[in-house]
Amino acid sequence: MTEKTTDNRNTFTTQATSRAEIRELLEGIFVAELLVPSDTIWLVSPWITDIDILDNRCGQFSSLVPTWGLRRIRLSEIFAYIMDQSIVHIVARPDPHNDSFLQKMRDLSKASDSPDNLRVVIRDTLHLKGLLGQDYYLSGSMNLTYNGVEVNHEGVSLDRSPESIAEARIHFQENYESDQ
C-alpha cells in the first residue's frame, strides 16, 4: 500500500513553538517568491502592517537581494522587489491601521521600474484572509499584522493543491479585480 501525500499543512498558534512555525512558513513562502516569483500575488487581509518577514541579521538571505544588508526585512521591501517581475494585488479594509503600509507600497510602486504592478483594492466588509501565489494558497484566521503573527490565537492552512489554488484565484479575480 502506498502512502498518500498531502498538499495541505495546518498550523495553529497558541504557544511560542507554533508562532515560530507561522514565522517560518511566511519566511519560506516569501523566499520562494524571491527565487521564482509568481506571475501574480494576492494578499487579502482586512488589516495589514509592515511586519518583519525575513531575519537577515546573520546574512543568510543576502544572496537573494545583496543590497538589503544584515537586518530584518519587512513585507513592503519584499513586495517592492517582487513588483519588478510580478503583479501584486493587495486587498484590505478602509482602516487607518492600514494607511501607513498601503502608502508605503504606493510610494515604492511609483519609484519602481514597474509602477503598474501594484493593485490596491479597499473593501468595507472584507473579512477574508489569504496569501495566494502561483503554487500555494495560505488561508485562515490570521491578518498579516504583528498581532496576527505574534500574539493572537490563529489558524492557517497552506494548500498547494492546484484545485484550491485555482478556486481561490477565481474568487479573488471575480471579487477584487473589477476595481482596476
Q: Regions from the language model: what does each represent?
A:
Residues M1-Q180:
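PLD/PLD-like phosphodiesterase catalytic module centered on the HKD motif
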